[in-house]
Amino acid sequence: MPLSASLPSKNYDYDYDSVQPYFYFEEEEENFYLAAQQRGSELQPPAPSEDIWKKFELLPMPPLSPSRRSSLAAASCFPSTADQLEMVTELLGGDMVNQSFICDPDDESFVKSIIIQDCMWSGFSAAAKLEKVVSEKLATYQASRREGGPAAASRPGPPPSGPPPPPAGPAASAGLYLHDLGAAAADCIDPSVVFPYPLSERAPRAAPPGANPAALLGVDTPPTTSSDSEEEQEEDEEIDVVTLAEANESESSTESSTEASEEHCKPHHSPLVLKRCQVNIHQHNYAAPPSTKVEYPAAKRLKLDSGRVLKQISNNRKCSSPRTLDSEENDKRRTHNVLERQRRNELKLRFFALRDQIPEVANNEKAPKVGILKKATEYVLSIQSDEHRLIAEKEQLRRRREQLKHNLEQLKNSRA
């Protein structure tokens, strides 16, 4: 039969509806405030901050270990109000070592057991209202105990060592269920022996998809068929608390970082924690953001890594090709500038040499290049005219010498 959070039930199996929205199912949507209003409580409508907090509800608690209490077999299928209050107290918190369904009402931890607050979303008002409802129920239960009413008479005794015999009459279904629980409890390991650490420090994970919602909440719901009881026994046999403890000590870096951030967010002054005796190995943190990382095999991962490296190299080449072109252009421009500077220096030196050869501008260090060229042209033309004049004088002198030589020979002949 599907569980409904909006309709109150007198059966103790559905009494955990009072603790919603701290628990939720995968198939149904629970509305804690609507259920509280239908029950006629004094809770006020939720504030906008509470609506935001409700979107990030706390995780479902793992199921409890099979109970070793058998005195419930003698009671009816519908327990009294005291048993219902005890179930609520068992869900809200208690001592992890205590294996029975009933905690001591006079214990201080029993009265102060409330749900841990989520410090990120400041959802303290909903928890305060829940604590108020539970406190009223506990006060009613203690008053009934003092008056010596039937609630005190329905208090169960200490748990027996062996499984109870199945009773006859209207309590046959409860007896059969407790008998199945006793058989399952014989195969279970006491978590308090090998796992003495509080379970609230580790973020719970999701149960298998086919798990019963009542099993997720840790409520002992009588199985409808024998196959359901066999499935519950198989789930109980799969529990390995030692392996979970070792895995808790050797966590991966991602889980440790996530849990470290959650521990920093938790207030250190709050001693109130939720403790459960049975831990489900197949758990998942739904409050954590969805992981986009996909696990690949080793060979495929190597191929992907090599492909990423090649892609990065090609991208680097594509990105560096414009830079290479720019660097080449800069080198060419730099080389051209150097050569042009050398040419100008050589031309300047030649102008200085030409200026030194021209008498008119030889002593003028600030003579312009155009003036040097003009004076050089004039100087060359003057030198050429002097050359022509000197050549003409030389020819004239040569002729004069020839004439004088001829005259000398004539004189010698005349004397002879």
From Swiss-Prot:
Record field: compositional bias (Acidic residues): 228-240
Region: Leucine-zipper, residue numbers: 390-411
Biased composition (Pro residues): 156-169
Cross-referenced InterPro entries: bHLH_dom (IPR011598), HLH_DNA-bd_sf (IPR036638), Myc-LZ (IPR003327), Myc_transcription_factors (IPR050433), Tscrpt_reg_Myc (IPR002418), Tscrpt_reg_Myc_N (IPR012682)
Gene Ontology terms, MF aspect: DNA binding; DNA-binding transcription factor activity; protein dimerization activity
Domain bHLH residue range list: 331-383
Any one annotated GO CC term: host cell nucleus
Leader sequence residues: none
Domain of life: Viruses
Compositional bias segments (type: Low complexity): 212-227, 245-259
Annotated compartments: Host nucleus
Start and end residues of each stretch annotated as Disordered: 144-174, 203-267, 315-336
Keyword list, A-Z: DNA-binding, Host nucleus, Oncogene
Biased composition (Polar residues): 315-324
Pfam family, one: HLH
Extra remark: This protein is synthesized as a Gag-vMyc chimeric protein. The sequence shown here corresponds to the Myc homolog fragment of the chimera.
Reported function: Transforms avian and murine macrophages and fibroblasts as well as murine B-lymphoid cells.
UniProt subunit comment: Efficient DNA binding requires dimerization with another bHLH protein.
Protein name: Viral myc transforming protein
Source organism of the structure: Avian myelocytomatosis virus HBI
Gene: MYC
